[in-house]
Amino acid sequence: MRFFSLFIHRPVATWLLTLTIVLAGFLGFRLLPVAPLPQVDFPVIVVTASLPGASPEIMASSVATPLERALGRIAGVSEMTSSSSLGSTHVILLFDFDRDINGAARDVQGAINAAQSLLPSGMPNRPSYRKVNPSDAPIMIMTLTSDTYSPGQLYDYASTKLAQRLAQIDGVGDVTVGGSSLPAVRVDLNPQALFNQGVSLDAVRSTIANANVRKPQGAIEDSQLRWWIKTNDELHTAAEYRPLVIHYRNGAAVRLQDVATVTDSVQDVRNAGMSNARPAVLLVIRKSPQANIIDTVDRIRGEVPELRNTLPASIGLDIAQDSSRTIRASLHEVEQSLAISVGLVVLVVFAFLRSGRATLIPAVAVPVSLIGTFAAMYLCGFSLNNLSLMALTVATGFVVDDAIVVLENISRHVEAGMKPLLAALKGVREVGFTVISMSISLVAVFLPLLLMDGIIGRFFKEFAITLSVSIAISLVISLTLTPMMCARLLRPNAPRQQPRLRGFGRILMAIQRGYGRGLHWVLDHARWGLLVFVATLGLTVYLYISIPKTFMPEQDTGRLMGFIQADQSISFQAMRGKLETFMRIVRDDPAVESVVGFTGGSDTNSGSMFIALKPLSARSDNAQQVISRLREKLTKEPGANLWLMAVQDIRIGARQSNAGYQYSLLSDSLDDLRQWEPKIRRAFSALPELVDVNSDQQDKGAEMALTYDRTSMARLGIDVADVNDLLNNAFGQRQISTIYQPLNQYKVVMGVDPRYSQDISALNQMYLINKEGRSIPLSAFAKWQPANAPLSVEHEGLSAASTISFNLPEGVSLSQASAAIERSVTSLGVPASVRGSFSGTAAVFEQTQSSQLWLILAAIATVYIVLGILYESYVHPLTILSTLPSAGVGALLALELFNAPFSLIALIGILLLIGIVKKNAIMMVDFALQAQRQEGMTAREAIFQASLLRFRPIIMTTLAALLGALPLALGSGDGAELRQPLGITIVGGLVMSQLLTLFTTPVVYLYMDKLRRRPRWLPVEEKS
């Protein structure tokens, strides 16, 4: 330890070293990004393809399957799911954590190109892909409203001008425009008029397509000039299409306006969007993988004034919801907790040392250690988030420990009359090894975390490194700056203390004397002490097995997501009414600030809602209580359900579902899947551990099944392709031509007038023109009858799939729900052809259950190895580790007392306790070993003296760690539900370990000392 004496003799160099650490930390702090949690984004790519008018089964077989076969060959794909609905297919690719998203995107594009020849020729566009996770909650929602512009015009502004600009902002991954569709010229045909005029639907389609053509015409030039040829070959508005001549009948022209209603409308009239009670077009913005939410939101807000300037004055552009508000509030709460922790820790030092000069030393050491950590965080690419700031908050109790141990030992020599400089040199030499042992063994706790991969490794890495760096800086400061300041600030003859402080000192001395008497009794009855140790070990195991467990604490981010699912045969008009009803119910709740929603498109019986709650200070209930209150009202609406879930800062997987957790069913037999899925879903619905049970299997949609008489068709001169074209032209909202404009392209959409498509009798009015020019009614060769058909077809890994989603009621943990599901599935006797498993967050939770125990054991083993190396002993590390069971009992009992399930955050607390409570034993064992080796004391005399000498620093360090974590445990502001399990675990573990280990550790030391003297296979040094 002579090296550290240089810093005591060279104060200028020491201060400059400290200043360098502080300046680097301030610079790093200013450059650090802000985020809710460490970056744990999964690489996800969504491939989208469309074929207007195609049924879900056709989309699944002709579009999804060829794409899946090509995409499934890409390396690093961990999960591939697809969903095919009316005219639309989405294939979601979830990649391994270490897969580069840009490289994966190149492979995806190559697979799409390879599958192109296998896709239907009638697709209006090639399949496209987006690098965005569709299950992520949006970071911002904007609304466009107007009293003068139609929804189609608003949608045009949103998709043409706003979405393009927003998508260019760094960090924006996807901008979805909802609530309407692009403007289009709609041709609504009258089947009866067509029959009377002898005109086929395909003739109308062909006429329109040929009348709107955009092709180059070339140029004419002479010796002087060149003239470009321009014709009126394009039609842009409904007024230009109406006079088109379709046919001549008896010498008279039959125009389009004679057989159809031609209007300037939208591509898909079955779309609706609402913002609170007002029709609106929505811009739903999601971030790209690895993007920072706060930075992205700030960039978007910076663009809003310019975006508003591009719009007409009568169009309002508003930010309806912003996810950064609660994130900023939560981080502000953590920063407050950090400041309070620092203040409490300094007060502990002042209360024990009763000297302002002495208190100033750790008051400098703690901020320097914390501030210096920011530099390392920046160099590692970390962010200021809840976990990293929680690490710094907890670190206040750790970083002060080293300073306290050094300061207390030097103060003891100064109080004994030694000069401060000599006391500093002797004090740091005596406890230098102890401080190094405590710090290295504490950092060793996190080594297994740093070596882990997957979600836990990625999630814990930032916390572990932040805490480890702060401890490392604290170690350097405690052995350099702290003894140097002690040598210059402490005084041998301090003035008399105030009576109140002398009173505190007398109380502490009385407690220490009482502890000495109690320790005498315990050492005289060592077997009872050993029995207590064994009992705490058994109780720890029992509590760990029995305590409810979950993945992460349920957060209140101030945002809810709602998913509407109505009867599968519901009309769009009725579905829009359900949306308005549900939005009104939600909007009337006193905790709700705003609500936006939309329905329509390919999802004919579903809709989505995004709800912003009032700030936590303005409402009395948390998000789960609001959901429970609304659930009672929402269940009264017949024919539809609205499922709500609280938005979480971390959600695992890429599945879009109507609830927070998923259970997937796979089968190679679609019939088996459709037979067993309803049975399993009903069984889950009966479980009290689950609520909002629903499924994505929708196979009860209304279908009109047509059966062709092929013999009659051959006799009448009609083939199947002609009939399919007829039906597609009539009912498929077929896009038959493209209108080119400077900023966008629009479609001409053809179909029968809605009056003729709202009743099955419309099929009786369908006619074909055969090869002989005769009108043949559809009924002459086809029969039809109602049937059921799927509204969507789901695949996972080329197997038929169905996902059952569920939420948890208040007071039920994920482990309890998982166990109930497993029991239910077992009791049903589901055949082997139907395979069930958890997916998303629930799947990762199942995987982490076994790894948690191994992680704790690995941390203990690592600490044992490090301590064994430091002490050159097999036995003494066991003495130090004997403090852990009591801490485990305290932590788990505290979680039970506060009704908090064991989560990943609580696991962090357990790992921290492994590092904290062993410090007490290290201080005892280190001094006891010195006394035995240097003064020839017996083991009992040595451990008794060490316990009394180290009583004050043990109490100080424990109180410092406890009070450092107390603001986390007692916090009640934004994000408190994420911080509380960590604080509760640490406080509970410290209280219990402090009460027990002061007595059990000396007992274990005596038994271990006897043990190390017996075996002959131990090293010679151990037996001496």
From Swiss-Prot:
InterPro entries: AcrB_DN_DC_subdom, Acrflvin-R, Multidrug-R_MdtC. The chain crosses the membrane at residues 15-35, 333-353, 360-380, 387-407, 431-451, 463-483, 528-548, 853-873, 897-917, 953-973, 984-1004. GO terms for cellular component: plasma membrane. GO terms for molecular function: xenobiotic transmembrane transporter activity. Disulfide bonds: none annotated. It is found in: Cell inner membrane. The keyword Amino-acid biosynthesis does not apply. It is a multi-pass membrane protein. Belongs to the resistance-nodulation-cell division (RND) (TC 2.A.6) family. MdtC subfamily. This is Multidrug resistance protein MdtC. It comes from Erwinia tasmaniensis (strain DSM 17950 / CFBP 7177 / CIP 109463 / NCPPB 4357 / Et1/99).
